[in-house]
């Protein structure tokens, strides 16, 4: 197999892990593209991206155009005479002229099994939707949003204890191996591109802070998925005692209750049980404003009066007598 001359384009840590795999491979990296340095930290000093830092460490040429729509930037890229361009979480739009520049075009590492979740937040949306698996797709890029032909797919089961953070780590390990396998197949001419089935496509819109507010009228199952999907950002939260309280871990309880949604059913070291639109959700780990995340047991030691059974969340009043609960059938 003849090694490929590769342009790599990426910005965050997830992308840097794929660049490292290319550095360790037999292929030639002839240029690394990353977004311009951004102000970061308290001093707002310009900070290089993880991809740029890794490229400099290995003496690879770095390019940081503000846009690839610029003719000069396009000419500079064309002069590299690449066989292929690998794009991983780059963050800039690639116009058609750029997509068509490398001999084998541009390929992308996408964190889902296409066409299930296209877009910016496939990991989070897969969790929230209750998908049982996710994975990595290596695809040939076109002018659409994650609509290109699929070259290779890997699969990964979603476990009950997975959060977006844990799935991110798992896919960050799986992605580089999939990328190298796909490049080997392309270099040997052994990969067959597969068209995406448009009828199976969904758009994984970027998460917003507004979506992170817990709606107790939803089912316990949906809220449990939501809390996992929004960890580590933006973290699901609810308002109670005029405080925004973040929820980092929860579980679907085997209890049932006919109390209004948002009612505290019980509170103890094992968790705080909340009535929902369907079922009971147990809160296990929370974070009060300005404090570090703590187990519910520790929070009750200092704020036990906030979580009296029978209290309706986002209220300081009891709704009546302590609600009756029973084991779910």
Curated annotation (Swiss-Prot):
| Gene3D superfamilies linked to this entry | Formyl transferase, C-terminal domain, Formyl transferase, N-terminal domain
Q: What keywords would UniProt list here?
A: Protein biosynthesis, Transferase
Per the record, the domain of life is: Bacteria
Any one Gene Ontology molecular-function term assigned to this protein's record: methionyl-tRNA formyltransferase activity
Q: Does the keyword rRNA-binding apply?
A: no
Q: PROSITE patterns attached here?
A: GART
Q: Where does (6S)-5,6,7,8-tetrahydrofolate bind?
A: 112-115
Cystine pairs annotated here are none
Its Enzyme Commission number(s) read 2.1.2.9
Q: What does it catalyze?
A: L-methionyl-tRNA(fMet) + (6R)-10-formyltetrahydrofolate = N-formyl-L-methionyl-tRNA(fMet) + (6S)-5,6,7,8-tetrahydrofolate + H(+)
Kindly indicate whether the keyword Nucleus belongs to this entry: no
Q: Which GO terms describe its cellular component?
A: cytosol
Q: Which SUPFAM superfamilies match?
A: FMT C-terminal domain-like (SSF50486), Formyltransferase (SSF53328)
Its job: Attaches a formyl group to the free amino group of methionyl-tRNA(fMet). The formyl group appears to play a dual role in the initiator identity of N-formylmethionyl-tRNA by promoting its recognition by IF2 and preventing the misappropriation of this tRNA by the elongation apparatus.
Xref: NCBIfam families = fmt (TIGR00460)
The record's family statement is:
Belongs to the Fmt family.
This chain belongs to the protein called Methionyl-tRNA formyltransferase
List the taxonomic lineage.
Answer: Bacteria, Pseudomonadati, Pseudomonadota, Gammaproteobacteria, Alteromonadales
Q: Which gene encodes it?
A: fmt
């Amino acid at each position: 197999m003849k090694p490929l001359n590769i342009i790599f384009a990426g910005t965050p840590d997830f992308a840097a892990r794929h660049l490292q795999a290319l550095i360790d491979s037999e292929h030639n990296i002839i240029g690394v593209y990353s977004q311009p340095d951004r102000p970061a930290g308290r001093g707002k000093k310009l900070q290089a991206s993880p991809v740029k830092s890794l490229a400099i460490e290995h003496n690879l040429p770095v390019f940081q155009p503000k846009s690839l729509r610029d003719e000069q930037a396009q000419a500079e890229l064309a002069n590299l005479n690449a066989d292929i361009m690998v794009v991983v979480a780059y963050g800039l739009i690639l116009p058609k002229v750029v997509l068509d520049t490398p001999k084998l075009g541009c390929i992308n590492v996408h964190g889902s099994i296409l066409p299930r979740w296209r877009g910016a937040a496939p990991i989070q949306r897969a969790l929230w939707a209750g998908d049982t698996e996710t994975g990595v797709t290596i695809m040939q890029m076109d002018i659409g949003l994650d609509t290109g032909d699929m070259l290779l797919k890997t699969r990964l089961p979603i476990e009950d204890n997975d959060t977006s953070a844990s799935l991110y780590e798992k896919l960050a390990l799986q992605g580089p191996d999939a990328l190298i396998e796909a490049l080997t197949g392309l270099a040997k001419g052994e990969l067959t591109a597969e068209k995406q089935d448009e009828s199976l496509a969904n758009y994984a819109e970027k998460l917003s802070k507004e979506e992170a507010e817990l709606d107790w009228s939803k089912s316990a199952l949906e809220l449990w998925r939501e809390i996992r999907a929004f960890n580590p950002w933006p973290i699901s939260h609810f308002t109670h005692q005029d405080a925004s309280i973040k929820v980092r871990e929860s579980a679907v309880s085997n209890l049932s209750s006919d109390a209004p949604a948002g009612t505290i059913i019980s509170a103890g070291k094992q968790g705080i049980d909340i009535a929902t639109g369907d079922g009971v959700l147990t809160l296990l780990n929370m974070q009060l404003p300005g404090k570090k995340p703590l187990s519910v047991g520790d929070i009750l030691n200092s704020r036990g009066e906030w979580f009296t059974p029978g209290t309706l969340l986002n209220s300081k009043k009891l709704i009546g007598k302590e609600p009756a609960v029973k084991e779910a059938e």
